[in-house]
Amino acid sequence: XXFENFLNANXAYVNLD
């Protein structure tokens, strides 16, 4: 993906295209 975002609610790291 190109967009990177942090999910503070779950403290997880995800990559969004």
UniProtKB/Swiss-Prot annotation:
UniProt GO MF annotations: carbonate dehydratase activity
Leading EC class: lyase
Protein name: Putative carbonic anhydrase
Family recorded in the similarity comment: Belongs to the beta-class carbonic anhydrase family.
Record field: catalytic activity: hydrogencarbonate + H(+) = CO2 + H2O
The keyword Chloroplast belongs to this UniProt entry's keyword annotation: no
Keywords attached to this entry: Lyase
